[in-house]
Amino acid sequence: MDGWQRAFVLHSRPWSETSLMLDVFTEESGRVRLVAKGARSKRSNLKGALQPFTPLLVRFGGRGEVKTLRSAEAVSLALPLSGITLYSGLYVNELISRVLEHETRFSELFFDYLHCIQALAGTSGSPEPALRRFELALLGHLGYGVDFLHCAGSGEPVDDTMTYRYREEKGFIASLVIDNNTFTGHHLKALASREFPDVDTLRAAKRFTRIALKPYLGGKPLKSRELFRQFMPARKARADNTNND
């Protein structure tokens, strides 16, 4: 692949004294692994550009699973993520790294990712709606088709007041039992529209995406979730100290 294409760095790590190993999400080639030779050297003009959440144009080539970065240019400054939105962005990056196969094109998902990061950078409230929309988009691109609007058992439209149990590869069927795998018709309509007007529908969306993504993630926990769990108590402690001043 020798042409320029849009890209974001998902993760980077030292590869040698002067080089970086990059996990990159590109518009045309999907997720690729690149060696950025000389990127760690003091004279490199790439060091500042090869950071997560910086829109890039990249050109790379070579054979095998690991390609060589030929050129990279920052299209703009990094999207401004900090605090809870930074941890949310790291979660999205890790999700892509864990779920997408190498060099499989997901051009539409690339723009879903861009919109998610832009939404996180622009929010002054909760990042949850942007995260849930991206997770649902990711599931859709992976071929995880779910009909949220009809009962899998009867084919009837879902009723706001009824409860439905999710069954993998089948969909939602009416249920009299309420547990972690059940959702109201109101929840399912929110999932279908990807609009979450209240805390209850957001929580339901999070439950569903956790269930649906589990087969793709396996038993290995996400590092970003653990970092987020560590961040939240520290954030609360800082807020309490500020309020007590």
Swiss-Prot record:
SUPFAM superfamilies: ArfGap/RecO-like zinc finger, Nucleic acid-binding proteins. Gene3D superfamilies: Nucleic acid-binding proteins, Recombination protein O, C-terminal domain. Keywords: DNA damage, DNA recombination, DNA repair. One of its GO terms (cellular component) is bacterial nucleoid. It comes from the Bacteria. InterPro entries: ARFGAP/RecO, DNA_rep/recomb_RecO_N, NA-bd_OB-fold, RecO, RecO_C. Involved in DNA repair and RecF pathway recombination. The keyword DNA repair applies. One of its GO terms (biological process) is double-strand break repair. Belongs to the RecO family. This is DNA repair protein RecO. Signal peptide: none annotated. The lineage of its organism: Bacteria, Pseudomonadati, Pseudomonadota, Gammaproteobacteria, Enterobacterales.
